[in-house]
Structure formats: C-alpha cells, structure tokens
Amino acid sequence: MRPAPLLLVLLLAWAALGGVVLAGALPRWSWALVATVIGTLALLDLWRQARRPSPQVQRELPEALALGVRREVGLRLQTTEPMRVQVFDLVPGGWPLESLPQRVQLRPGHACALHYTLQPQQRGRFRFEGVQLRIRSPWRLWWQQRTLPPLLDVRVYPNFVPLTRFALFSADQASRLVGAHVKRRRGEGTDFHQMREYRVGDSLRQLDWKATARARKLISREYQDEKNQQLLLMLDSGRRMLASEGGLSHFDHALNASLVVAYLALRQGDAAGLFAVGGERRWVQPQRGMGTVEHLLRASYDLQPQPVATDYLAAATEVSLRQRRRALVMLVSNVRDEDIEDLLAAVRLLQRRHLVCVASLREHELDGALEGEVHTLEDAAQAGAAALYLQQRTKAHEALRSEKVMVLDVTADALPAALVERYLAVKREGLL
C-alpha cells in the first residue's frame, strides 16, 4: 500500500498549517484536530480498500507463440465496484512490450477490454505469473498493488509464420518467396507422370513414338521429380552457433531455415527429419505428410545452443546407425579451420550411404571488416585478422569440396534461400 498524491497533498497542507500555528495565527488544538481528521480518513480509507474485492481478470493469448513475431494480447477486467486501476501484465523473460502499463476506470456490470503487444525473444516454455494491478482506494488516498491470476504457460516456437504463409502457395511459389531461384523444367524428372499431347518446347526424348503412331499425333511422356525421398537436417547446436545477428542466434537462424526447407520437401512428397547435435541431442525420424511439421516444431522449440564443442564424427556415426535409407543430409554449422579434420572424417562416413551438403554460416561483420576503410593501426589489424580468418575458412570449404561435398557459404539471412535452392537442385538433377 502506497500513499496516493491526494494524501501527500493533505500531509503537505497539514505541515504548512503547522507553520501558521507556530506563528500564532491559529490555536495549537486546530493543528492537532486536522492531524486527527487526516489520520482518521486515511485509516478508514485503508480499511475500506483492504476489504474491497479484486477485479476478475482474463487473458486472451494462444499457448503457442512464434519467436521474434509481435503478438497482440488481450486483457479483460470485470468488477463489482467502481475503481481506478493501473494494469501491468507480468510478461516472462523481459520481452519488449508496447502499450503497458495502462490506467483504466472500471465500472460494475461493464467488462473493460484492453490490449498490448509483446515480442518473444527466446524459444522454449515460459510462464505468465499473473496480472499486476495498482488499485486506487475509494477516497483516493492510497494505491494498493495486487497480483492476480490468471497464470499461463506458453510455448515459444521457432518462427513458423512463413510456413503458414507458404500454405497459400504452390511449392514453386513458396520457394520464390524465400528468395530461391527455381529453374523450371516442363515435363522432366525421374518418375513417369502421364501421357499428353506434344507441346512446343518439349524435348525429342519425351516423345513416345508408339503412342504417336497409334494416336496419329505427337504424344509426349511427362515426368515429375521422384517423391518419397529422404531429407535429414543436421543442426549444430554447439558453441559455433552462439553468435548473434539480427536479434537471433545463428542456431535460431539455422532452425528457422531448416523448417522452411523441410516444409517445402514435405510439400513435394518427400520425408523430412531433424537431428540436433553438439549440445542436447534431438532426433526426429524422417517422415512424410504435413503433420511432420508439428513434430519438428515440438521437438525443437526448446533447443538452445550450448557452449560445448560439437563431435561431428560421433554425430555421423549415430546418423549411420539410425538412418538406413539413402538421404540428403544437410548439415548447418559454422565451419572453422580447427574443426576440419573431425568434419572430414564425419562426411566421409556419411557419404558411404548419403548425399551430403554442408551449409556454413558466415558473419556479416566479416564482410564489413574487409570493405571498410583503413585509417588507423587498429583498423589495419582488424582487416588483417578478418582476411586471415576468411582465408582459413575458404581453405576448410575447399577441403570439403575436394571430398565431393556440396558446400554453401552464406550469411544467416540468405540461408533459407540457399538451402531451398540446393534441395531443389538435388531433386532436379536426380542425385538421390
């Protein structure tokens, strides 16, 4: 319970009255009388406030939120007595808020609805500990703070908003939405789809001469990309993925991009799975069907990168034991020169059965360090260190390419498009 401004004003007026009494303008008993009146009013108001029932509060918010996506939250308050309150929701994790706190006047029989926006900053499970109200007493002499239910547990998932947007488009259109450059091939692929009349632009090898002779017109065979192939996304959750760009860790960027390419693979009729390595390990067996997206989200929403070294060879061994069918294995990490021997041994093991692609995330700061002007000795030292690091990084990538590994050297924001392009290229070329 805290004094309200009105009580403070009354106390200041009482103190000023004391100066008048000391000057002899008023009798001493008048000062004591005013003190008694103010004290009695304050105590009565305090007693009345303590007996007032708390408002009823309801929170309108889904239990699933997306990382980094602003969400509107609704609060609904009802009371049996008129009262003035200040409302603040106890949001977890120190997430950024807009439009809180708010002051509202509650009236009996009328529900008061207010809204604010929040932006989750971390994946995982979190709890809203309640709604905090500062309630003004009936005579406006006190502010009382009360914490009321409802408690609410929420899950913050990787950013699934692009996936809901992709559902409105075909696989090719969704690929273009993430920036992937799709090469269209009409009627070509590895699986027979149908017979149809010849169209301008069809290749001669598509012509079916027996069907043409029977129909007495040109008939083409139409093929499509093979379906029911396997995609396994290996995500490094070790120390290499702790770097942060754009408010998200490299691991978050990798996870978001992996969900995008997995979604598109499922739309193409393929099976998609996930394997987190480095920190806490999670395995989702490649499965077909759009319901797999929910499995991937639930398996990965609380994964966090850990400050530990990633054992690539142990991870590759586990993949070899678990994933018996040939698959496109996409490893997303931040490849360093000191990791290359272990990584080379891992990809050699994987290549005995699988097609391997390594996506190596590159920090934006490295590009800026080389492009910036050099004016001081410190600038020169930073540029030299960045150049040496990039040289070692390129050397590591070349070592992987020498083993016939597909290597993607990309920044975090370009990762979704790069993964989608590579996946579609593998499908187009029939490499699986």
Ranges and model annotations:
Residues 2-7, 31, 339, 423-432:
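C-terminal signal-anchor/stop-transfer transmembrane helix together with its immediate cytosolic
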Residues 388-429:
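C-terminal helix of von Willebrand factor
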Residues 357-367:
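Short, flexible loop segments at boundaries between secondary-structure elements
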Residues 335-341:
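Active-site glycine- and acidic-residue-rich loops that bind
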Residues 294-296, 365-395:
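Acidic, Ser/Thr-rich peripheral helices and adjacent loops at domain boundaries
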Residues 36-291, 326-331, 345-349, 359:
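An amphipathic, basic-hydrophobic helix/alpha-beta surface used to engage anionic
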Residues 292-328:
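Von Willebrand factor
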Residues 1-58:
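Extracellular/lumenal glycan-associated context and N-glycosylation machinery
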